[in-house]
């Protein structure tokens, strides 16, 4: 894949719609610790989340959105507390999962749902009934 400095280097780039991209970028930066990669005028902002990325675009927020953004983090408990202190609605508190992750779910100020996951152990899929067919 060729790289273009104007486009995030990620293979999958979720785009989240917010009525005010600047306010959204500021909020997710403060609440979830993401950083701005590139600001395009006042209507589109590319964000970095560790080695992942997503884009915030201007538009009308659709009700009953059918997406969830999963972000790999370190320290789920601390991250959850930071999100809560900055106004995130915590849907599920951090919990250990049988597949080796500690996860929590949050909703941001526009109703976007986020799943934050911290690896706590390397568990083979067959140990938790993951049914893996191809792992690299």
Which role does the model predict for each range below?
Residues 1-26, 53, 67-69, 117-136:
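N-terminal beta-strand motif that seeds the catalytic metal site of vicinal oxygen chelate
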Residues 30-37, 87-89:
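Conserved acetyl-CoA-binding loop of GNAT-fold acetyltransferases
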Residues 43-44, 98-99, 126:
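Positions that flank functional sites
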């Amino acid at each position: 894949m060729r790289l273009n400095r104007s486009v995030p280097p990620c293979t999958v780039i979720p785009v989240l719609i917010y009525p005010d991209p600047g306010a959204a970028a500021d909020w997710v930066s403060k609440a979830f610790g993401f950083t701005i990669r590139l600001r395009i005028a006042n209507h589109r902002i590319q964000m970095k989340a560790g080695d992942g990325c997503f884009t915030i675009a201007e538009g009308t927020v659709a009700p009953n959105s059918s997406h969830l953004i999963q972000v790999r983090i370190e320290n789920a408990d601390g991250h959850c507390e930071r999100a809560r202190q900055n106004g995130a609605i915590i849907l599920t508190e951090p919990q250990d999962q049988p597949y080796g992750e500690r996860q929590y779910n949050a909703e941001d100020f526009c109703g976007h749902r986020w799943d934050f996951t911290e690896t706590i152990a390397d568990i083979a899929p067959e140990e938790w009934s993951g049914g893996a067919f191809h792992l690299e």
